[in-house]
Amino acid sequence: MVILEFLQTLLRNNPEIALFLAIAIGYWIGKFRFGSLQIGGVAGSLLAAVLISQIGIHIDSGLKTVLFALFIYAVGFQSGPQFFKSLGRQSLREVLMAFVLAISGLFTVLAVARMFHLDKGLAAGVAAGGLTQSAIIGTASSALEKLGLPLAQTQMLQGHVAVGYAVTYIFGSLAPIIICVNILPWLMKRGLREDALTAEAEQMQGMAVYGDGERPALSEFVSRVYQVKKAGQSVQQIESDHVTVEQIRRQKNLVAVTQDSTVEAGDLLLLFGHRADVISTGELLGEEIKQPPHDMDVVIVRHDVLLTNKAFVGKSVAECSQILSQVARHGVYFLGLKRGDKTLPLTSDLHILSGDIVTLYGTRQDVDRVAKELGSLLTRSLKTDLVFHGVGLVVGLLIGLIVVRLGSIPLTLGSGGGALLSGLLFGWYQNRHSKSGNMPMAASTLLVDFGLSGFVAVTGLQTGQQAVTTIMQQGITLFMLGVVVSIVPLIITMLFGRYVLQYKNTAVFAGALAGSRSANPALGEILNKAGNAVPTTSFAITYAIANVLLTLLGPLVVAFS
């Protein structure tokens, strides 16, 4: 008993401890599986926060704004390049997704309000919580003031908006996680991670980018050691078959490798290059050594180079190859070229532009030598450019302050929408100007994970006590109506996207579905399962549209319920 009183006092006086405790317990809960269902750390944090909130904790709402801004800015920054590339007629499906969910959400709310005789305040609250669109509280409350009702009745209805929101918000946050992360992959019969890799490979024009710890089973470049059977060939002759002789071992000693070096019978040669070229050249040289000496190994690096040398600008790849002598190119392989947000295959007639990023592959000394000829190495710094990203967040929050009025209805992106838009813009800019705005993937991942889990934990700590109390007072009916409002529009939109819009990629589809519900917690779990930022592009499009459409539901529910 003394321990419980101590914990209550501790958490009430130190809400920051309650916040981190909710996150820790939530991610622990999120690890458990119930059949094929795993709620994940974000939903777990929300449940843990609701449980902790029962002791009565006050936590500042400003913290929730900051955490969500960090989360959504990082999401926008990761997906900015692909987002702007996707805008156009090809994004029509995402627009339709957002409209279908908003319309089906409106009719679902009106149906349950009529069937169960909810007043306008409770109906609007169920819409706000069940659809997890907090802005509906504001627009519905403003609409209630325009009805000309007595002040006491207006205030009562506005209070009912908050009650309906508090009761239904928690499951409203869980529903899109369950549907997007568990039910949608079951419907599509494909996993999020597999389709995320497929979509990324298509965006990269066949050049797949693998997640941490993932590598292709069939590597494009290989190293093999062969024992020479017949003497007489020079290194230059061997390398004419598009391979590189990296090491020569004669008897028990390594010898210097030059273009004029002549190999002798019994020499061990370390060949490096494309798999097919190495195998075909090696078979002509002699027998492959299955267990080569350790001193023959070399370290291979892969680096991006920002092309700034004017001697290469405007030239084709073939012309650039001629400018770079064979000696300068020795041992270096060009993997690809990135221009803005597009990855281009290195064909002989492709013309080079200033600012292109070329990916080189070879030994460190060879890559460094060629990089000096082309421009400058783009080193992967572990430092985050906080000047760049601090300005980005300021710009986003300022955008969120802008209010446009549609009649009596105030429309605003809010801090979250503003930070998302700013993240998209700054991510796009950084992609085109790689020297500034660096943010390591680990740093942006931390912002996404901590920002989102912290946001939902603060929400749970703020509304959890009221939600449980209201359920006790109002009964389970209101909660179940929220379940219906949360699930039915998502199911309708999911089926519409699958069978009418013909979505084929599970990761892209999941992002679009989560965005059409403005379901930020669901996005976090989708990104966790996908392992890359592919779902964010479709999410960003539907989220921006849904943020406006769902906000407009407040006055419509008040008018027609």
Curated annotation (Swiss-Prot):
Record key words, sorted: Cell membrane, Membrane, Repeat, Transmembrane, Transmembrane helix, Transport
Subcellular location per the Swiss-Prot or TrEMBL entry: Cell membrane
GO molecular-function term, one example from the UniProt record: monoatomic cation transmembrane transporter activity
GO biological process: potassium ion transport
Domain of life per record: Bacteria
Domain RCK C-terminal: 205-287, 294-376
Protein name, UniProt field: Uncharacterized transporter ZMO1681
Organism: Zymomonas mobilis subsp. mobilis (strain ATCC 31821 / ZM4 / CP4)
